[in-house]
Amino acid sequence: MSEFKEVTVTKAASVYFDGKVTSRKVTFNDGSFKTLGIMMPGEYKFGTNEEELMEITAGECEILLAGATEWQNISDGQSFGVPANSSFEVRAKTLIDYCCTYIS
């Protein structure tokens, strides 16, 4: 899905890692939400409260899920899931454009 209809967008960005990662919350009429954001090239570690589906809409990165021993290459049009109460690491090789869906 390349666009969302009938949503509310939170104007203020959430800013992480000294401004190298930002996102904005998109809330749907049913109360579910996603975040749309970017990551500058670099290495980052994120924690999850809810299950997440991370879709990479542009860029190239490597990811390491909690408990995994091998990094996975992810690029434009690919996605990966992260369990609730877990973590994952990202090595952004290029500017990353992403959409994160929170699954409750």
Curated annotation (Swiss-Prot):
UniProt-recorded Gene Ontology molecular function terms: guanosine phosphorylase activity; purine-nucleoside phosphorylase activity; thymidine phosphorylase activity; uridine phosphorylase activity
Keyword Hydrolase in record: no
UniProt keyword annotations, A-Z: Glycosyltransferase, Transferase
The enzyme's E.C. designation: 2.4.2.1, 2.4.2.2
GO cellular component: cytosol
Pfam families, A to Z: Ppnp (PF06865)
Catalysis performed (reactions): a purine D-ribonucleoside + phosphate = a purine nucleobase + alpha-D-ribose 1-phosphate; adenosine + phosphate = alpha-D-ribose 1-phosphate + adenine; cytidine + phosphate = cytosine + alpha-D-ribose 1-phosphate; guanosine + phosphate = alpha-D-ribose 1-phosphate + guanine
Catalytic EC class: transferase
Top-level taxon: Bacteria
Record flagged with keyword Ligase: no
Membrane-spanning residues: none
Task of the protein: Catalyzes the phosphorolysis of diverse nucleosides, yielding D-ribose 1-phosphate and the respective free bases. Can use uridine, adenosine, guanosine, cytidine, thymidine, inosine and xanthosine as substrates. Also catalyzes the reverse reactions.
Family: Belongs to the nucleoside phosphorylase PpnP family.
This protein's name: Pyrimidine/purine nucleoside phosphorylase
Annotated organism of origin: Colwellia psychrerythraea (strain 34H / ATCC BAA-681) (Vibrio psychroerythus)
Name of the gene: ppnP
